[in-house]
């Protein structure tokens, strides 16, 4: 399809295309006639001859040598037979005790704050619906002051 489109677009290509198609088989025949017959079968007979090229193909190049092993960048370890001094376990114990004590202090403060928040008296509603806080240190109920949130009627 592509070849037909190419040929139809360019009308001048017909002669070169026909020449190519005619000479292509001849070129293959010329290549075959320049080769020598070689007997390659186990039984040597006239019917068992194959056409091969005169020279054998060149040998393959040898494979490249393997890469050298990687070198270590770190210094070699010292050949010491004595054991290194062990770190004291007291420093780890001190850190653990400090973390536990800090956690206990935090939890105690948290419990105290929550206890005081629960014990505090809730807000009571005034007669007109405004919220008034009751605190233990406040004045007696007979001594009522003017509420700031109270609406004047």
Curated annotation (Swiss-Prot):
GO terms for biological process: establishment of localization in cell. It comes from the Eukaryota. This is Proline-rich membrane anchor 1. It is found in: Cell membrane; Cell junction; Synapse. Interacts with ACHE, probably through disulfide bonds. Residues 56-70 form the PRAD domain. Residues 59-71 have a biased composition (Pro residues). GO terms for cellular component: anchoring junction; membrane raft; plasma membrane; synapse. Isoforms 1 and 2 are expressed in the adult brain. In matured cortical neurons, only isoform 1 is detectable. The lineage of its organism: Eukaryota, Metazoa, Chordata, Craniata, Vertebrata. The chain crosses the membrane at residues 93-113. Residues 36-92 are extracellular. It comes from Rattus norvegicus. One of its GO terms (molecular function) is protein-membrane adaptor activity. It is a single-pass type I membrane protein. Keywords: Cell junction, Cell membrane, Disulfide bond, Glycoprotein, Membrane, Neurotransmitter degradation, Signal, Synapse, Transmembrane, Transmembrane helix. The proline-rich attachment domain (PRAD) binds the AChE catalytic subunits. Residues 59-79, 133-153 are annotated as: Disordered. Residues 1-35 form the signal peptide. InterPro entries: PRIMA1 (IPR029659).
